[in-house]
Amino acid sequence: MSPTYDVIVIGLGGMGSAAAHHLSARGARVLGLEKFGPVHNRGSSHGGSRITRQSYFEDPAYVPLLLRAYELYEELERATGRNVATLCGGVMAGPPDSRTVSGSLRSATEWDLAHEMLDAKEIRRRFPTLAPDDDEVALFEAKAGLLRPENMVAAHLQLATRQGAELRFEEPVLRWEPYRDGVRVHTGENTYTAGQLVICPGAWAPQLLADIGVPITVERQIMYWFQPKGGTGPFVPERHPVYIWEDADGVQVYGFPAIDGPEKGAKVAFFRKGQHTTPETIDRTVHAHEVRAMADHMSALIPDLPGTFLKAATCMYSNTPDEHFVIARHPAHPESVTVACGFSGHGFKFVPVVGEILADLALTGATAHPIGLFDPARLTAPAARGVQP
């Protein structure tokens, strides 16, 4: 039997690495367990870039968490010297009544966030790479930008190690169980015990957290990189924003400036347009018809973007039915287990503040952060299951 720890963290991707950092920063004896190597590309915390924004169309309830996350981006950069965030500005575009535009405006208004509303003519003037229809508008947020996911995970792992956390990679968790006054975790190599367990399973949530009763579906997501027709000059962060663009049919795409030099292009992707999958069966091959569909869609929005196709990569979303997160004490084991899952394709920008929340819950049983929206009871109550009382 290995030594007992204060807290074991299962999963060292975005959320788990942040939890390991915040827990160890508070003096806890932490063991982190990861199925793959550090900063791997098999889950949901890779791909070179993620959008961050405060005018949050999903729900205004997320905004206070984002304000704290932005503070933690800066702290992380100061503590590690790694580039984590580049706030190059962001455009949330589409028809005025689209969720992307109207929801972003709602959050910006409710929380008094700095923003500008642009009509199609002004969008084209400010950002010549973009070609909106005359009836489209955009909310521009100067504080939006991009995150470097691999850098953020590496920074949190670096700090956790510096603070004394023991991190074990290539050691998949087979199962866990309540044990005495805490938990016991079994891997293929050892059995570990701790007073508290934090589970950040990503796309492995259906296996590791089946007993919380939340139906989480895993979705295959594709990221594409194109070399623009005239080169990357007009697409550098100083000239081209991050964007989320919704069409009249509700299809959303999101994309980034060219951030990796003149030869590596710019990244774009559809948002939630993938097939259901599992971590074991996901198709990691990106097919020619998928590349064509992406290029065809973007040719109307950003005509110069789909010049030469460079590469593509897959990742996985873990979606809840309402697309809101699950962050809570485990319903069946509230005294010793904390869970974080179902980030539904929009969670990475919250990584540092989720780590802070998970440390609060594991060490004190509560958090001052507003997380009522993320209670799994909303999805497991009789009404959520379609059962009449």
From Swiss-Prot:
Keyword Oxidoreductase applies: yes
Free-text remark on how the cofactor is bound: Binds 1 FAD per subunit.
Residues reported to bind FAD: 6-36
Primary location: cytoplasm
Gene Ontology cellular component terms for the protein in this record: cytoplasm
Record's catalysed reaction(s): sarcosine + O2 + H2O = formaldehyde + glycine + H2O2
Top EC category: oxidoreductase
UniProt subcellular location: Cytoplasm
A GO MF label: sarcosine oxidase activity
Parts of the chain that traverse the membrane: none
Stored InterPro entries: 3-OH-isobutyrate_DH-rel_CS, FAD-dep_OxRdtase, FAD/NAD-bd_sf, MTOX, SoxA_mon
Keyword Cytoplasm: yes
Residue positions, PTM S-8alpha-FAD cysteine: 315
NCBIfam families: PRK11259.1
Summary of the function given for this chain in its UniProt record: Catalyzes the oxidative demethylation of sarcosine.
HAMAP family: MSOX
Listed name of the protein: Monomeric sarcosine oxidase
The organism's taxonomic lineage, starting at the top: Bacteria, Bacillati, Actinomycetota, Actinomycetes, Kitasatosporales
